[in-house]
Amino acid sequence: MKPASTKRTDSSDKANLLRKALVTHVVRNVACDNHEIEAARGEKAIVALARANIYNLLASAYAEPPSLQVVRAIADGTLLRAFRDVGLDHVAAELDAFVPGRDAKDLLEEMEIEYTRLFVAPGPDYVPPYQSMYSDELSDGSTALANDGKRLDKRQLWGDSAVAAERMYLEAGLAVTGELREVPDHIGLELQFLQHLCGREAEALNTGRILAAEESVRLQLAFLETQLAPWIDRFCQAVGNAARHPFYRGIANLTLGFVLSDVEELRRQASVIVDGAMGSGDVCSV
Amino acid sequence: MSIPKLSRRQFLALSAATAGVAALGSRFVPLPQTITPAGAAEPSLSEGQWIPTCCHMCGGTSGILCNVVNGRVAKIKPNTDNPIGLANVSSDYWQHKSEGAAMCPKGNAGIFTLYDPDRVKKPLKRTNPEKGKGVDPKWKEISWDEALDEIAAKLKALRDNGEAHTLLWFTEDSSFTDIQADFCDLYGTPNYSMHSNLCDVSRKAIFKSVMGHDRPLGDTVNSKYILFFGWNPLSATKWSHLPRTITRGIENGARFIVVDPYCSFTASKAHEWIPIKPSTDGAMALAMANVIIESKLYDQKFVDDWAVGFDQFSAYVKDKTPEWAEKITGVPADTIRRIAREFATTKPAIVDAWSGPGQHSNAVQGGRAIAVLAALTGNVDKPGTIMIPNKGGGAHPPIRVKKTDKPRLDGLSKFPMGHSSGVYTEIISRILDGKGPYQPKMAVVMFQNLVLSIPGTNNVIEALKKLDYVVVDDIYLSETAEMADIVLPGSTYLERYEVIGQWVTWPVVSLRQPVVPPIFGQLPEYDVVIQLGKRLGLKDADGAPFFESLKYEDYISKMIQGGSAKITLEELKALPGAVWMDPKGTQYEKHLAEVKPPEGATVDPKTGSVKDKDGKLVGVKVGDKVHKGFATPTGKLEFFSESLASKKDINGNPIDGLPAYTPRDWYPDDKFPLFLINWKESHHTHSRTFNNPYLMEIQNWNRLAINDVTAGKLGIQDGDEIWVESPYGKAKAIARVTQGIHPEVVGWQHGFGHWGFGKVAKGKGTADGQFNVTKSDPISGMALHKEVCVKVYKA
Ligand code: SF4
């Protein structure tokens, strides 16, 4: 999103370090009188909510077996359209060719089996949905070889990436529930964490708490850059290769496209915030 | 893969288009306000906590300390507050505690098992009705509630139909056993079975019959002569103190002799390795007895006071000369003579035998011949001899239950020295031949890979196929899980409780406790049992619901309170290292304790056994004193077992009261000219550690050891691909040509050859059970892992 206004300038000459806080303070206090800013904020909130929804959609695709609703959304064309809208025409076409004449229950079971084969039951096509299996070192550094002369893959669950992910959850005031416990760097949890942060951003924007919204955006970007983005590519490629069902190929494509686009967008936004607050003096750039 | 680039507009469109398609309930909860985010993460950050618990990478339960940093297990080290891992007699423990304890490679590699990416994480339901080796079950994840509801519904239907007894229950034997036994009793099946009959129940039978205790332990540290038949304790560690206690014994001056067809790691550290033909150890022991008695080197007074049947025994061994034994065993008569003299004249001495001679059809009698050597030389329960441990442990919490009167499927009661763990091979055979009292319908398999552990792999697969419904609870998709209708994700030892009270010679109670919560939120096995019991509404004999409000912590707290520690779970947790021990330490010669016989007690003039008026043994009269004696039927060590002599084995053959030598049933012939044996090493347990890369790095293939002379005759060279063939199976293997194995024997390490299980384990080495016949020894029900003959030829 482009900043709503670039016309007003701040003529004060305060130290850069103080500027950002001051600016947001000013915005927070004057915003309600300024329709333009309010509208912009509203639009940002809408985008944040949309992002939260998409993160939730993706999280659910990896965190639990498909539901009947998903099957219906495939059958009635909802997902087809959605895939088309974002330029995944070939996935849409595959999905289209897949569905007709199929009983919803059969289709559901087929997708449950596919989901389990890909993300749950270790086997030849298993794509471990855990960051540590991608980001962590392949081996413990030992040069010992197995007695067939091969180096063994020693990556394990709950590696450093999981610890780092959990730490960021805790910093954001969130803990993984005991009941539906999973290892903290499960793709579903990482995506859902972003859903929470986007939701927070939207809520903060809607209640005029600009600092909180900014904080959430900062956390989103930090989490994406340090946790999700570094492995999402390899994960989605692996899913794309292993998936037999077009739905999961489509979801993998969509995940990768969306996450990378979101990172890019957030980076752009962040640079604008930094520029605006710290450099050009563009008070309304938030 | 095409990666779309999405604009913000498309975000909005996508969100709108997919609204309501899927909504994942939150997997996060807000942290309580009182915990600041920093506070939540900080305290555990740097050094974390050290939590005492017990290893279970094998059944040995060595004491360990786990370092948990940020909710993750970062390091495991030995716990010197627990003697298991350090010593098995108290004086040695107290004296050397400060030197530190040990963990074997498996224990050191335990963290990987906890965090193995190939673990089963969610309950899985089979959707492909076809079952078989390598057939994709087409798993589908289901929720825990669905899984438990479905299993409970199957169990309920069976029970409502009056068929509760057709449920088979299999479990590992050193974890959460009591509560499973309770479940089976309350549910109404007699078919509760455990792993032990795949392990060492013949040894249990041997020592139970000779000295009244089924698991004596050697005080090797204090010994001067250590003689082992078919045991590899320096490598096949169970309790990581084993190697130390033996090498300390050697340092203290013990001479160490190993009789084994294979030059095991242990044999390689011995003063002498004596290669022997498999299953003939009993013959060598009888010849040793012959020499010892002929040369009057036995302990006359001890035998007179503390043994029965000596005269019959000495008459029996009169013609069991070293020359006689040489023909059977392949061990030179002079060697037998020399070992017999050394053993009888060096005091104190230990003689012991484990699974080497223990997994053949003549295991019990052969083993008894070895065990009586201890009685003959007075080397029993004294410092430096084989010891009768004082178990501490926990007591099974009291439960009132009316057990079913239906017979067991395996006919356990017909095995004269059968073990409460049942007879797996008979279960498999009855499912297949239909000759049991009924056909079983359902099985629950806890933490057991039956397919790779019961002799006769194909039979096991076919038997499992015949059951209507199979539940497997395991941390891996094992070859047995591949045959299941439902798989539940198991827990590792770092995620669950256990009370441990054995493996050393004095009463010690130690605790295994979860150091991290189950990492996938899964239920530990005992909670699965509780949940099923609850759903079924199982009631005790008084009609009180047993599982309804049962918490496993309370259950084991009662176990601890009922045992020798007499403290609660919380009190045990608070003790250093979570270990309680009896300050009195190891007691020797416990049979000498004097007892006061009750009014009306009578003495058997022949044996000295003192019995109360109901005929119950209350002591043994030696001289003019009445002692506690041994827990045998006569209260004395038994060269001759009256009780065995009165019974028939499972084949209906009478049993000799003496440890008579008979050859095992299956001997090499022209077609299958080689004995095939197997063994274990420190880096693997059963078939269950083979997905651990740290352990596979040590050994990831079981090449077939073959003597160089034999190999030369067959034109086989080291590293050659070969065929191994028995009447029951044929598979490829790789040859390891060595001088360290008897020329008539080939052998390898057990546990390899997975075709499922995990990506590290899969396809490594050759599975040994496929060559075997599905049989047990006819006295104890011990699975015959080593009674197999093969031919070997170049592939
Ligand atoms: S012997 Fe090794 S695997 Fe077994 S309990 Fe001890 S440390 Fe663990």
Residue ranges and their predicted role:
Chain B
Residues 288, 307-424:
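Active-site phosphate/pyrophosphate-binding segments
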Residues 162-166, 298-303, 350, 381-388, ...:
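Flexible, glycine/charged-enriched surface loops at secondary-structure junctions
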Residues 135, 229-231, 269-270, 319-324, ...:
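Flexible glycine/proline-enriched surface loops and loop-helix/loop-strand junctions
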